Amino acid sequence: MKRITIKELAERLGLSPSTVSRALAGDRNIRRETRERVSRLAGELGYRPNPVAVNLRSGRSNTVGVIVPEMVTPFAATVIGGIQRVLYGRGLKVIIAQSDENPQTECGNLELMERFMVDGVIACPCDATRNGEIYRRIRQRGVPLVFYDRAPLRVDASRVIVDDFATSYFLMEHLVRRGCRRIVHLGGPAHIPNARERLRGFRYALGKFGFVSDGRSVIPAGVTFDD
């Protein structure tokens, strides 16, 4: 279905595009009869404002972009739900884009957020060594940026992350105190900082509690359910 534009509305009504635009915005300097004519025809033809054009005029989108690596785990669902509750409660809209643990997809999603002129970005990067340039560009443009769970290297931005080293160490300590002796670490990909820190905590605990680290104590794994 063809999208109806302000220009087409103006031609049908015999008005200038600027008058139609102001009438649709409820400008009281436009006669009430004119505003009603414009509103009536816009409704009949199914006119919908172009969000990008509206954002350009106002300089704001009242929208926050959220970049996630996946949306199937309980952790991801909890985080997304929390973000939505907080932002919706403040009158903001949310655009969620999944990178599927692919840096190229993540880059495309970030470029999409730029085109939509989002007022902020919340992201969980899939690779700490990739897409730093576009994240820095977003920051340089003055767009608020917050990383959660993971953060890329050399990008100065707010972050909400877990101390994975300490968490891994204390988990090992708990298992040792419960009498466990054959403990195996399922390690994630090395390009994910969380995975590196968890492995570091595991190995530190092995040494502290007198375990001998051999090739069988660490099993490489991915980040999906299939892995």
Language-model segments: residues:
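Short secondary-structure boundary segments
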Residues: 99, 125-128, 150, 187
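Amphipathic helical "hinge" segments at domain boundaries
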Residues: 36, 45-123, 200-203, 207
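Secondary-structure boundary/capping motif
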Residues: 75-76, 105, 130, 156, ...
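Bacterial carbohydrate/catabolite-sensing allosteric modules
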Residues: 12, 44, 85-90, 108-117, ...
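Active-site-adjacent beta->alpha loops and helix N-cap segments on the catalytic face
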Residues: 129-139
